[in-house]
């Protein structure tokens, strides 16, 4: 995704902490005018958001987009549910994974691609507490090894 024309607005780092992200897909999102202006200003929070499939459509819940300052009476509800745009085949594939395998749809990133807001949707499996502790231990061990090699190269 290091292509020109893509500007990452917000990352959901908590998703990588709480879930194993097994697959990622790109989805468009239906927004109002003041919502896209707030997103371009970077006033969006993905932290507690999730997606759900209802009647063959994918909906995004709890995505907080702050009201636009100059929006006056045309401003939007910050937490309204928003429809995601996916191909029919992608939705059918997601239905099977979510219902039978017990996976969850979590937005991992929101970005602008050629002027359009896109959401990177992760198909995720929840982590248990011992998985989180194991990840933290691995990260600390890796950091310690890198520190050791860095100091060894300096001659300490």
Curated annotation (Swiss-Prot):
Main location per the UniProt record: cytoplasm
GO cellular component: cytosol
Any GO BP: trans-translation
Keyword Cytoplasm among record annotations: yes
Stored Pfam families: SmpB (PF01668)
Name of the featured protein: SsrA-binding protein
GO MF, any single term: RNA binding
PANTHER family for the chain: SSRA-BINDING PROTEIN (PTHR30308:SF2), TMRNA-BINDING COMPONENT OF TRANS-TRANSLATION TAGGING COMPLEX (PTHR30308)
Keywords: Cytoplasm, RNA-binding
Entry-linked NCBIfam families: PRK05422.1, smpB
Function: Required for rescue of stalled ribosomes mediated by trans-translation. Binds to transfer-messenger RNA (tmRNA), required for stable association of tmRNA with ribosomes. tmRNA and SmpB together mimic tRNA shape, replacing the anticodon stem-loop with SmpB. tmRNA is encoded by the ssrA gene; the 2 termini fold to resemble tRNA(Ala) and it encodes a 'tag peptide', a short internal open reading frame. During trans-translation Ala-aminoacylated tmRNA acts like a tRNA, entering the A-site of stalled ribosomes, displacing the stalled mRNA.
Family recorded in the similarity comment: Belongs to the SmpB family.
């Amino acid at each position: 995704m290091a292509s020109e024309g893509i500007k990452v607005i917000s990352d959901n780092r908590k998703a990588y902490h709480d879930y194993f992200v097994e697959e990622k897909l790109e989805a468009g999102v239906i927004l109002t005018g003041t919502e896209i202006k707030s997103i371009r200003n970077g006033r969006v929070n993905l932290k507690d958001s999730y997606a759900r499939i209802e009647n063959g459509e994918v909906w995004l819940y709890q995505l907080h987009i702050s009201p636009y300052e100059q929006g006056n009476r045309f401003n939007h509800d910050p937490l309204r549910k928003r429809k995601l745009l996916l191909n029919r085949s992608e939705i059918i594939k997601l239905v099977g994974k979510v219902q039978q395998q017990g996976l969850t749809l979590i937005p991992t990133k929101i970005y602008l691609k050629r002027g359009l807001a896109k959401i990177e949707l992760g198909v995720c499996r929840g982590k248990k507490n011992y998985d989180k502790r194991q990840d933290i231990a691995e990260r600390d061990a890796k950091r310690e090894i890198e520190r050791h090699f860095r100091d060894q190269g300096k001659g300490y």
